[in-house]
C-alpha cells in the first residue's frame, strides 16, 4: 500500500501536535524516494535490500533535527539497539575517524555503497519513474488476468503488488516457482478477514528489474500464461 504525501503530512501534523516523532518505515518503498522535510517525517528507516539492490547488512536511519535532539537526550539500556551510540559511530566515520561498537559486515557495506553510487549515477528521478512504470504495468497485467488488488485505487504501491487469490498454489508461490519465479505469500491483514483469506505478493525491486521493464513484464506474463495452460 502506498500512502500519498498529503496523508503523510497530515499524520506528521497530528503527531507533532502532541509532541511526538513521526517514524516512517520505507524498507519496502523501493525507489519511491520520500521528501522528509516536505512530509514532516522525523525518522525514516530503510535497509540495503529491496529498493537498493544490495545485501541486508545494516539499518538506515535518517533523522530530522527534532529527532536528532531527542536521540541525543536519550540514555539507552540496550547494547545493540542504542541508536545514540550507533549515531556516534557513524559521525566518527563521517569526520574521517574510526570508532568501534561491534564487528561490521564491511564487504556487504562496501557493496551497498557501490550500488548507491551506481543508482545515483543512473539518476534517482529516472529510477523512480521506472519504479512507477513497472508497478503500473504489472498491476495492469494482473488485472487483465483476473486478479484483484488488495490496495484500493490511489493507494496501490508500485514496488510490492499484493493480490487476492483462491488458489493455494498462488498463495504459497509454488505455481510461480514451477515457472522459475520467486514470489511470497501475503501476510494477514489482522482486521477480521475470513479464515479462507489468501493473497500473494510480487516484489518489483532491484535495478535489474527497473532497468529492464519490458523483460520483467514479459517474464511475468509468460509465467502466468503457462500457469493458465497447466
Residue ranges, per PLM feature:
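PLP-dependent enzyme catalytic core of the Aspartate aminotransferase-like
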Residues: 194-230
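Active-site core of PLP-dependent enzymes with the aminotransferase class I/II
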Residues: 1-18, 32-34, 213
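Active-site C-terminal subdomain of aminotransferase-like
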Residues: 52-140, 144, 208
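Conserved active-site segment immediately N-terminal to the catalytic lysine
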Residues: 37-49, 59
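Conserved PLP-binding catalytic core of the aspartate aminotransferase-like
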Residues: 148-179
Amino acid at each position: 500500500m502506498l500512502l500519498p504525501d498529503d496523508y503523510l503530512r497530515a499524520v506528521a501534523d497530528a503527531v507533532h501536535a502532541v509532541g511526538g516523532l513521526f517514524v516512517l518505515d520505507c524498507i519496502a518503498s523501493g525507489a519511491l524516494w520520500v521528501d522528509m522535510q516536505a512530509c514532516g517525517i522525523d525518522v525514516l528507516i530503510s535497509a540495503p535490500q529491496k529498493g537498493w539492490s544490495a545485501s541486508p547488512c545494516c539499518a538506515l536511519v535518517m533523522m530530522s533535527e527534532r529527532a536528532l535532539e531527542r536521540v541525543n537526550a536519550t540514555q539507552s539500556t540496550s547494547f545493540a539497539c542504542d541508536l545514540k551510540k550507533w549515531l556516534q559511530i557513524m559521525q566518527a566515520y563521517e569526520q574521517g575517524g574510526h570508532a568501534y561498537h561491534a564487528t561490521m559486515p564491511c564487504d556487504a557495506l562496501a557493496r551497498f555503497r557501490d550500488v548507491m553510487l551506481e543508482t545515483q549515477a543512473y539518476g534517482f528521478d529516472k529510477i523512480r519513474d521506472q519504479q512507477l512504470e513497472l508497478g503500473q504495468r504489472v498491476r495492469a497485467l494482473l488485472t487483465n488476468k483476473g486478479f484483484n488488488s488488495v490496495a484500493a485505487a490511489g493507494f496501490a504501491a508500485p514496488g510490492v503488488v499484493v493480490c487476492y487469490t483462491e488458489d493455494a498454489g498462488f498463495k504459497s508461490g509454488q505455481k510461480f516457482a514451477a515457472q522459475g519465479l520467486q514470489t511470497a505469500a501475503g501476510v494477514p491483514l489482522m482486521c477480521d478477514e475470513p479464515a479462507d483469506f489468501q493473497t500473494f505478493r510480487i516484489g518489483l525491486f532491484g535495478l535489474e528489474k527497473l532497468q529492464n521493464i519490458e523483460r520483467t513484464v514479459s517474464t511475468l506474463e509468460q509465467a502466468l500464461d503457462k500457469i493458465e495452460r497447466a
